[in-house]
From Swiss-Prot:
<comment type="function">
    <text>May be involved in the production of the exopolysaccharide (EPS) component of the extracellular matrix during biofilm formation. EPS is responsible for the adhesion of chains of cells into bundles.</text>
</comment>
<dbReference type="Pfam" id="PF04230">
    <property type="entry name" value="PS_pyruv_trans"/>
</dbReference>
<dbReference type="GO" id="GO:0016740">
    <property type="term" value="F:transferase activity"/>
</dbReference>
<keyword id="KW-0270">Exopolysaccharide synthesis</keyword>
<protein>
    <recommendedName>
        <fullName>Putative pyruvyl transferase EpsI</fullName>
        <ecNumber>2.-.-.-</ecNumber>
    </recommendedName>
</protein>
<comment type="similarity">
    <text>Belongs to the polysaccharide pyruvyl transferase family.</text>
</comment>
<dbReference type="GO" id="GO:0000271">
    <property type="term" value="P:polysaccharide biosynthetic process"/>
</dbReference>
<keyword id="KW-0808">Transferase</keyword>
<dbReference type="InterPro" id="IPR007345">
    <property type="entry name" value="Polysacch_pyruvyl_Trfase"/>
</dbReference>
Amino acid sequence: MSLQSLKINFAEWLLLKVKYPSQYWLGAADQPVKAAAHQKKIILTLLPSHDNLGDHAIAYASKAFLEQEYPDFDIVEVDMKDIYKSAKSLIRSRHPEDMVFIIGGGNMGDLYRYEEWTRRFIIKTFHDYRVVQLPATAHFSDTKKGRKELKRAQKIYNAHPGLLLMARDETTYQFMKQHFQEKTILKQPDMVLYLDRSKAPAEREGVYMCLREDQESVLQEEQRNRVKAALCEEFGEIKSFTTTIGRRVSRDTREHELEALWSKLQSAEAVVTDRLHGMIFCALTGTPCVVIRSFDHKVMEGYQWLKDIPFMKLIEHPEPERVTAAVNELLTKETSRAGFPRDVYFKGLRDKISGEAQ
């Protein structure tokens, strides 16, 4: 590990183990969240402020779900960085029926320490609350660090008497059943699929592409360039988009940034992507999509929720000719552009959360 990496790791450790916990224990002068004790509340937390619109879509959809399914509760949003300084105030203003919902995503495990350690802080601190972990992907690496982090997670998760875990894929579901045996575990799709942006009329033109360029991509740079060249030769100019936009996004700007991206997708004739939320955004906007598998199980298993949608097609071996053929197939196929049938998976979820249905 380089000296720069060591410095970054140490700075993050100080933040998570010293600065943020001290804000909780000492109390912060500026309480960012106000809540009334006479009103029952759902605390929605672990909310992001980085540049990944996939995570922001999860936060946006989670709030939409709670507002629709829990109209009798106030929804109190708490950003990940603010939960430490807000926790005591929220507990002091507790209503007996208050609950905590933690947004889902792909940050459960040892890869994203900030998110995982904050999740554990929430579970420990709100020990006497009903705590619901919304659909997540878990990955603890088979390393000394990964095994150590898993052991800590098991201790904290299993000690909470009212923790409900949701897995958004089969691999995570089996992992949770094996390692968090004392918890109730549900399998649910990514919360973004609760949304529907397929009804807006749109003139569609052109093929769009959104491919990863990091360690999660199954494509090497040369392969990625060959795929793009083949698409350009077949369809002309290929427009690119990304779900990581290079600027921080807040609760105030979240909806604007998401709607801008969804509007762009609604203007596409077809999309080629290897990003989980690139695929999911196509499903909710009714946009034909060719899905290229990623390095891990995340996209492959996420596709299982969408495989019956006629305008979605998975390519496991992404040779350029296969990709262009799949795009042509979708462009010439007459299919309904209805979005994801959310009622199939989300109807009755409130009863499952309360333990009244299985």
